[in-house]
């Protein structure tokens, strides 16, 4: 415990927890304090002025980060016939119909994103209790229920990030790796923030983006001045 506390205190050195840093400085601080022995993920948290308990204040969407996420994303596709072949050629890791349903329904989920053709949704819909809590249920609003499975697979593999506001009005997402150069991280963050702004529900009143912070997987959180991520709402 003493070693853990010492490590945390060391990481926190030089970070003013009450200060709003501009985006560039925040990225630098987070990267400098990412000392784990693996390539940590850089994560963004945005506190929004919405109450997701009300359906008309739900915030969700998908954004293609210009520089990808740095993650290897495993993609499952529910499809039959030609669409199944299309998915395989596009690089999907798992493709199937009833047999894939049985695997997932049994609790084996060896993938990060799930795509389905519209005709498969009556079957996939029965997996709501399995996929829903994991945020993996295919949804046409984020492009994961589609006839263009090749494009959906390519987007998923290439840096597409889904976001959905949580109960407390917070959105979390991984937007890159510590190994990314600062400019690429900044581009990804601004693209993500822009997508969240564009997803603002009409029912949201008052200040939309209240707080923004960055952190790494094992590192300290750094508060960011929303204006420097082009957040103007």
From Swiss-Prot:
It holds the Pfam family Ribosomal_L1. The keyword Repressor applies. The keyword Ribosomal protein applies. Belongs to the universal ribosomal protein uL1 family. PANTHER family: 54S RIBOSOMAL PROTEIN L1, MITOCHONDRIAL, LARGE RIBOSOMAL SUBUNIT PROTEIN UL1M. InterPro entries: Ribosom_uL1_bac-type (IPR005878), Ribosomal_uL1 (IPR002143), Ribosomal_uL1-like (IPR023674), Ribosomal_uL1/biogenesis (IPR028364), Ribosomal_uL1_3-a/b-sand (IPR016095), Ribosomal_uL1_CS (IPR023673). This is Large ribosomal subunit protein uL1. CDD domains: Ribosomal_L1. Signal peptide: none annotated. Keywords: Repressor, Ribonucleoprotein, Ribosomal protein, RNA-binding, rRNA-binding, Translation regulation, tRNA-binding. Binds directly to 23S rRNA. The L1 stalk is quite mobile in the ribosome, and is involved in E site tRNA release. Protein L1 is also a translational repressor protein, it controls the translation of the L11 operon by binding to its mRNA.
